[in-house]
């Protein structure tokens, strides 16, 4: 669970709701036709721009914002270091049984190719190709959410214009002008909320998760290729430690290099 995402989501909602209550009547901020125009209209327009696999799968992707995305870079260094030590002592074939239980499919596949004697350049190409396709897939999803964030305020403004047209057509009833104006502006509020409370922050968080996953896979590629080349475990560690934050780097330097 990503605690920061929950704090941001529910905290911002609570502040907005409190502002509405303190400013008057919170019920005045709910208008079902405005929801249909802003949320439904902007979402359905995405069907025109993206295939069904994206428009129907976006909610599952957005749910990842609330899941922890710790890729355990420190543990990656420790594991690859231990494998490098073992391969130098007992040979690459000794790794075969150990890697079968790895949860990380990317690391497991790369190391299996090493054990099978595949050329280092071929292993690099395979792993970098998989990483490239993952990046492309993630960037499409982030682009989808950013596109929705662009459309939502536009549909909010569209609803407002529609409401203003209706208001102008009923100018003779001056007693309802204020209420009609308020209803017209609610759709603009919804569009702004969708973009600034939900969609833009979600795209940003998914982008950060994407960067962290790319970094972890780049570390794995470097480590797997170092094991394939028979590099000394300390050389492997020095290559991978540059990816870590200063605190973890100092701890692992003391553990792996300076002992």
Swiss-Prot record:
The keyword Protease does not apply. It is found in: Cell inner membrane. Its main location: membrane. The keyword Cell membrane applies. The chain crosses the membrane at residues 3-23, 28-48, 148-168, 184-204. Keywords: Cell inner membrane, Cell membrane, Chemotaxis, Flagellar rotation, Hydrogen ion transport, Ion transport, Membrane, Transmembrane, Transmembrane helix, Transport. GO terms for biological process: bacterial-type flagellum-dependent swarming motility; chemotaxis; proton transmembrane transport. It is a multi-pass membrane protein. It comes from the Bacteria. One of its GO terms (cellular component) is plasma membrane. Residues 205-259 are cytoplasmic. It holds the Pfam family MotA_ExbB. Belongs to the MotA family. Each stator complex is composed of 4 MotA and 2 MotB subunits. 2 A subunits and 1 B subunit are thought to form a single ion channel, so that each stator complex contains two channels. MotA and MotB comprise the stator element of the flagellar motor complex. Required for rotation of the flagellar motor. Probable transmembrane proton channel. PANTHER family: CHEMOTAXIS PROTEIN MOTA, MOTILITY PROTEIN A. This is Motility protein A. It comes from Treponema phagedenis. The gene is motA.
């Amino acid at each position: 669970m990503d605690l920061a995402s929950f704090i941001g989501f529910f905290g911002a909602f609570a502040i907005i709701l409190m502002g509405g209550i303190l400013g008057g009547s919170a019920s005045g901020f709910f208008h079902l036709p405005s929801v249909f125009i802003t949320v439904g209209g902007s979402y359905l327009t995405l069907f025109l721009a993206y295939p069904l696999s994206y428009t129907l799968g976006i909610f599952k992707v957005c749910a990842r914002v609330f899941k922890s995305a710790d890729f355990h870079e420190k543990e990656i260094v420790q594991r690859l270091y231990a494998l490098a030590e073992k391969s130098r002592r007992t040979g690459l074939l000794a790794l075969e049984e150990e890697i079968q239980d790895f949860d990380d499919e990317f690391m497991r596949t790369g190391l299996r190719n090493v054990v099978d004697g595949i050329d280092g350049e071929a292993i690099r190409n395979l792993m970098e190709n998989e990483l490239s396709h993952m990046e492309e897939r993630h960037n499409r999803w982030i682009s989808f959410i950013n596109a929705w964030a662009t459309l939502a305020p536009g549909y909010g403004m569209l609803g407002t214009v529609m409401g203003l047209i209706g208001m102008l057509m009923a100018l003779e009833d001056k007693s309802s002008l204020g209420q009609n104006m308020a209803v017209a502006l609610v759709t603009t509020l919804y569009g702004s909320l969708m973009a600034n409370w939900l969609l833009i922050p979600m795209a940003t968080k998914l982008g950060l998760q994407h960067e962290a996953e790319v970094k972890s896979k780049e570390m794995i590629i470097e480590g797997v290729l170092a094991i394939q080349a028979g590099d000394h475990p300390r050389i492997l560690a020095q290559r991978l430690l540059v990816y870590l934050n200063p605190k973890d780097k100092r701890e692992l330097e003391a553990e792996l290099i300076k002992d």
